[in-house]
UniProtKB/Swiss-Prot annotation:
Compositional bias per record (Acidic residues), positions renumbered to this chain: 712-732
Organism listed in the record: Homo sapiens
Stated consequence of mutating R471K: Does not affect methylation by PRMT9
Residue segments, region Disordered: 1-24, 65-136, 197-373, 400-453, 691-757, 844-895
Name of the molecule in the record: Splicing factor 3B subunit 2
Amino acid sequence: MATEHPEPPKAELQLPPPPPPGHYGAWAAQELQAKLAEIGAPIQGNREELVERLQSYTRQTGIVLNRPVLRGEDGDKAAPPPMSAQLPGIPMPPPPLGLPPLQPPPPPPPPPPGLGLGFPMAHPPNLGPPPPLRVGEPVALSEEERLKLAQQQAALLMQQEERAKQQGDHSLKEHELLEQQKRAAVLLEQERQQEIAKMGTPVPRPPQDMGQIGVRTPLGPRVAAPVGPVGPTPTVLPMGAPVPRPRGPPPPPGDENREMDDPSVGPKIPQALEKILQLKESRQEEMNSQQEEEEMETDARSSLGQSASETEEDTVSVSKKEKNRKRRNRKKKKKPQRVRGVSSESSGDREKDSTRSRGSDSPAADVEIEYVTEEPEIYEPNFIFFKRIFEAFKLTDDVKKEKEKEPEKLDKLENSAAPKKKGFEEEHKDSDDDSSDDEQEKKPEAPKLSKKKLRRMNRFTVAELKQLVARPDVVEMHDVTAQDPKLLVHLKATRNSVPVPRHWCFKRKYLQGKRGIEKPPFELPDFIKRTGIQEMREALQEKEEQKTMKSKMREKVRPKMGKIDIDYQKLHDAFFKWQTKPKLTIHGDLYYEGKEFETRLKEKKPGDLSDELRISLGMPVGPNAHKVPPPWLIAMQRYGPPPSYPNLKIPGLNSPIPESCSFGYHAGGWGKPPVDETGKPLYGDVFGTNAAEFQTKTEEEEIDRTPWGELEPSDEESSEEEEEEESDEDKPDETGFITPADSGLITPGGFSSVPAGMETPELIELRKKKIEEAMDGSETPQLFTVLPEKRTATVGGAMMGSTHIYDMSTVMSRKGPAPELQGVEVALAPEELELDPMAMTQKYEEHVREQQAQVEKEDFSDMVAEHAAKQKQKKRKAQPQDSRGGSKKYKEFKF
């Protein structure tokens, strides 16, 4: 606990930083348990667990706990003064296994927090002094040191009171505080007397360690540097002053007191090394003294500045504090509270001092630190690509947050005249109900933008995205939420890309929507209905419903097959004659829920009335349905044809009415034809006169053939270019540079160079010419020809006779026009081409006679013999198989 001291000057109250949580290891087990009980933590467990609990409490709250004062048996006596090993500046000795200090390495880094102040390595303090390093330094504490010590004690006391208030710990009563302060004062007095008594005797450490207070760097392996102000108080550790220990492994917990009895003596240092160390220490002291003088000057300046700023801030802050106090008091009256002690004035003064000390920190609190990354100067050409990769991952959200918060900061500064304090109280602001309520009454908290809101702010709108992309018609409302909206639209616009199914963003499950659509039961296609399977199944189901349970079970054991037998001819006709193609969608046109119920406008044509529409309008359906006028005809005759379809032929309006129909307003009448005063039709040829006016009019009117309502495919241009190239090839040459093939073969005029008898006859067609024509393939040959079937009742005397005979006459007639009578097809040698036509006809007749004679001579005896031989061979092969198969008896398999 803190000790009682006269209050130091207010301007110089500066809280030292808290010590690390490692100093709890030096406490005894009883002290650890007492402190844990004080903070309301469990006290069971071994020593290491107790230390760990205290350390975790310090880390979480930021409060450094001081060593408790254990009471004696009578309850009021203070605990005995601590041993010399626990005094500040005289740390625990290390275990005997220390680093040998003979060869000094380069100055090590400052020791870790929690280690003791500088003693010779591996030299216990109870076994006499080490070789002397320096002689003759003033031992008595100066006025400045005492003043600083008193300031530290007062600051600790005030800080402890503040913490007790903020944590709502009102259980400590005022008389207990006074008793603790008295005990602390007694302890401090005893420690001072011990310190002075020891300074008179030889001390087991170099005397400069008790000298001037300052920051010292480590001087090698022998002497560790003290960090922070060295105070003479053993129980109260100044906040933030880490106590360095000599190097080496720390002693196990609970063995600190045993080290005092360790009889091992450290190794002695040679004189040459001692002189070197003394020179180093003297240089270090000079440096430290200069630094201390500079620090004193800066402290004096800052204290003057702070006192000036405090006077201005006090006037503003006092009125606010009074209001806050009144509010808090009102709330405290409502809550059940315990009666506080008498010393309210002293606590009020302390509050003022603490607020002033906090106010002095305000100029430092306003400073904002900005971290700027240093960009390396690398002139490697490949470094640019490497740098671009990292630039892609830079976060821009933080910059936007700062920009948005700038106007909010200005509002905060205007609302709060006194700047807010940062530090301990700001961390616990949320826990303090009073202060948080007051702030909520003053002003609403500035809203912090979440990542979701930031993402929404950075999104494109649908209109912006449509402007940025090449195909805006593909953009949908949810495309802006994609990670890369431009890439998504590009992928959607790519040719032959299949879209993601629409139900990806639906809440309900796929095909589970029933939004007012009456789904009809499944209907069989018409070509399957014609087989009559539907009626047969319905009849069978009715029979099964009438059956008893017994007969049903009997059928399960011995099922009867062939209940629904359809004639094979019916099935054949259904699937080969009447089958229709199912409705298929094109590539990339995915099915979505309710697609089959949508109207397909592509199938509809203006002017053609479907059967459904006719039935709904009350018009007749059938072959003579076109003779009944539509109900809108009379309105069209009055107001004109529809402007969207100017060239649509509507009977009774701009085209003649059907035959055996008449104009008039009777049932089935076609109204009145639209004519002008002179009797001429207004909109078209209503009377069917086919006058020249209407024909020329229709010719003059150019119809726009460009497609509308659907985008043209992107590959249309390429196909058009190919068609143009093909058409160019087909056109005859108009330039006149290419000579046609026929022109050189015909002699333009004059006499023939070949005599009359030597001309090639026109009647002969060579086989070569036929083959060439077939090779050219100018006409696509027919794949097959259906032969008509002839039926004969009797086979007759023919050996291979059949009732089915095919009529070949139609095929022969289709082959082409009959050859001319004079033309003869004969295979001729080149020498025989010189013969006259009479000789050739004679040769042909001889050839025909020879063929007829061969046909008459031919008989079928050889074919009959072959057939009989084959039959015998089959019988021979079948006999041994039957003999083998007779040995085994197999059950006859039935379908």
